Amino acid sequence: MKNYLSFGMFALLFALTFGTVNSVQAIAGPEWLLDRPSVNNSQLVVSVAGTVEGTNQDISLKFFEIDLTSRPAHGGKTEQGLSPKSKLFATDSGAMPHKLEKADLLKAIQEQLIANVHSNDDYFEVIDFASDATITDRNGKVYFADKDGSVTLPIQPVQEFLLKGHVRVRPYKEKPVQNQAKSVDVEYTVQFTPLNPDDDFRPALKDTKLLKTLAIGDTITSQELLAQAQSILNKNHPGYTIYERDSSIVTHDNDIFRTILPMDQEFTYHVKNREQAYRINKKSGLNEEINNTDLISEKYYVLKKGEKPYDPFDRSHLKLFTIKYVDVNTNELLKSEQLLTASERNLDFRDLYDPRDKAKLLYNNLDAFGIMDYTLTGKVEDNHDDTNRIITVYMGKRPEGENASYHLAYDKDRYTEEEREVYSYLRYTGTPIPDNPNDK
């Protein structure tokens, strides 16, 4: 008799009906496969939600994928954080199934659950799978758990499996400390990100350094950390200064439940109480005490010295353009629009049928607006006043049978850059219109 994938209660059936991938909610509906790119390796898509024990509250999780063909290296973890127990088993036929351990799946879901937590009060602990958690393939075949709670999935042919449903969670509570740590090595690493768009900034490789060794309850302030960050910035990026702190997070002895420090106010971090750390002495085989560790990871926004923060609502650097498209024979206004741009180099013609031109502001045809069969005549008027630059583009009907982009100046496949440059009338202020604008 087959076992339901209970992972503890033998009540957990993994049934799989693929659905639309939602970044925060479970997958639903078979049409989701049509929108996903094809995969090269068999994958398990994990799209579950958390249900808080004893309540009706649901916790959303972003879906993630597990590559079923990755192999653990040298007894370590795979890319997905699965232990060496979750491994491939070769068979004589070449069909290589992948064994997924229950504990590994729960751990991967736990890590995803806390990945986007922004407050220490938002931590939840994954207890187990709920009874509606199911795994199937794209054909609806159900995969059941073995007696040990593991599930074995074939990886040939290449396909995607889905784990959906719920996991049971509860608010995270720290366990009482039985053997308090004696000292903690406080390590520090920092990452800098330019506040303004900045092509010159080259982030240095993150380096971890030992700040100090403290006892449980000792403190370190936000000002001390800021000074440390500024010192590293001065060394690696002397032309920049810190603008503001983005985040400060403390990882305790590799515990996934970290301490999130305030980002918008001054703070004092008190070294957290925890169990004494040990390691096995290779010679004696006995446990020996070692210093515990706190890794403080910070992120800061930085500015070039003398530069002001970019204001997305500041339009003082933008220029106003009024663009008019006029029928050269009747002077009828075909289309008009006003644009704000920071770069006059964008004031050039683009082909609506060519995505390479998407940054350019002027059209060489108006087909996309339902104004059909027009093209450039070569006649363009460029007028200025104190606040506005008015561009009038005169257009005429293109010859029957010609495509919308036949105009010599912008035919990218038939003419050289030099030939097309002649017809870039507006790219540089003062460039004259060609003498024979009808010869295009």
From Swiss-Prot:
Gene3D superfamilies: 3.10.20.150, 3.10.20.180. Keywords: Plasminogen activation, Signal, Virulence. Residues 1-26 form the signal peptide. InterPro entries: SAK (IPR004093), SAK/SK_sf (IPR036120), SK (IPR008124). Pfam families: Staphylokinase. It comes from the Bacteria. One of its GO terms (cellular component) is extracellular region. This protein is not a protease, but it activates plasminogen by complexing with it. As a potential virulence factor, it is thought to prevent the formation of effective fibrin barriers around the site of infection, thereby contributing to the invasiveness of the cells. This is Streptokinase G.
